[in-house]
């Protein structure tokens, strides 16, 4: 991902204030509610029968934290996202058979959640930088697909 120095500062500055557990759980939960067909990858998580069940599900929250921890690692390697996410790309492609479009959807949901959490601090410039990052991460995660 090519970011200007200003964009990198905006992304890392805001990310330093992110509660990975809260934002990760909310982002994954929203993905599962807004795009219910994504729930098929999480059948082992138990009750996903309603929006409140999804948003209150501890396994959704835990996996959301795991997802955002990996995203956080990617922010430290913006110049090598494909390398950073190579193993996760392989896992999601070969073993889990996740549709790579879901990575793009989750990235967009993450941007919504960040905007919700940070309000006025999530300026159009910050959003623009984050859109580049989530697109880059989605592309890196889709890299191993044939």
Curated annotation (Swiss-Prot):
Residue(s) carrying Phosphothreonine: 12
Stored CDD domains: Hb-beta-like
Binding site residues for heme b: 63, 92
Superkingdom of this protein's organism: Eukaryota
A GO CC term attached to the entry: blood microparticle
Modified residues (Phosphoserine): 44
Known tissue expression: Red blood cells.
Single GO term (MF): heme binding
Protein name: Hemoglobin subunit beta
Pfam family membership, one: Globin
Assembly mode: Heterotetramer of two alpha chains and two beta chains.
Domain Globin, first and last residues per copy: 2-146
Similarity-based family: Belongs to the globin family.
Keyword Cell division: no
Protein's organism: Loris tardigradus
Record-listed S-nitrosocysteine modification sites: 93
Keyword vocabulary terms for this entry: Acetylation, Heme, Iron, Metal-binding, Oxygen transport, Phosphoprotein, S-nitrosylation, Transport
């Amino acid at each position: 991902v090519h970011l200007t120095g200003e964009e990198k500062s905006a992304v890392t500055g805001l990310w330093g204030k992110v509660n990975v557990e809260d934002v990760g759980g909310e982002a994954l939960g929203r993905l599962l509610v807004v795009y219910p067909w994504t729930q098929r990858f999480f059948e082992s998580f138990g009750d996903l029968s309603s929006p409140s069940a999804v948003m209150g599900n501890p396994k959704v929250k835990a996996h959301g934290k795991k997802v955002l921890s990996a995203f956080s690692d990617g922010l430290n390697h913006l110049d090598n996202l494909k390398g950073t996410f190579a193993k996760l790309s392989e896992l999601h492609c070969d073993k889990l058979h996740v549709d790579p479009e879901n990575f793009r959807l989750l990235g967009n949901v993450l941007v919504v959640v960040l905007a919700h959490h940070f309000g006025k601090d999530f300026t159009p410039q910050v959003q623009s930088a984050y859109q580049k990052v989530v697109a880059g991460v989605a592309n890196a995660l889709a890299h191993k697909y044939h």
